[in-house]
Amino acid sequence: MCMKLKTITAAMLFGCLCAGAVYAAGEVEKREGMMKQIGGSMGALAAISKGEKPFDAAAVKAAVTTISTNAKAFPDQFPVGSETGSAAAPAIWENFDDFKAKAAKLGTDADAVLANLPTDQAGVATAMKTLGADCGTCHQTYRLKK
């Protein structure tokens, strides 16, 4: 009986450990997906700001909306236990309040752009400077160098 109990306990413990690893991997994939969406949105805005694509108010609004939405949800994708397996620096978890503040600033700045949506290429370029600076500040501190 004692041996069965030890075996069952060991199996349950192993299952919990595996479930935790799967959960963390899911969080990494989710946040990487969100970051790719932000990157794609920034790319779309950059193409308009450089004149590579014509100004399209709907495309600008969609891109900035994605940035705003993802920036606000982003900190929730970094639970304790998801520190490995991505380009996320350990500094995120060491300075989580600052990380959250940087994400919030990106969200707030994106909301400001949405409230005063650019009406031309120059306006998109101005918005890109602000949003790009927010991205760069966070990446410089909280993204591992490749």
UniProtKB/Swiss-Prot annotation:
Gene Ontology CC entries for this record: periplasmic space
Statement: the UniProt record of this protein carries the keyword Acyltransferase: no
Any GO MF annotation of the entry: heme binding
Keywords: Electron transport, Heme, Iron, Metal-binding, Signal, Transport
Cleaved signal peptide residues: 1-24
Keyword flag Iron: yes
TM ranges: none
Pfam families: Cytochrom_C_2
Post-translational modification summary for this protein: Binds 1 heme c group covalently per subunit.
Entry's Gene Ontology BP terms: electron transport chain
Residues noted as binding heme c in the record, renumbered to the chain: M35, C135, C138, H139
Domain of life of the source: Bacteria
Gene3D superfamilies reported in the protein's UniProt record: Cytochrome c/b562
Quaternary structure annotation from Swiss-Prot or TrEMBL: Monomer.
Main function: Low-spin monoheme cytochrome c.
Protein's name according to its UniProt entry: Cytochrome c-556
Originating species: Agrobacterium fabrum (strain C58 / ATCC 33970) (Agrobacterium tumefaciens (strain C58))
Lineage of the organism: Bacteria, Pseudomonadati, Pseudomonadota, Alphaproteobacteria, Hyphomicrobiales
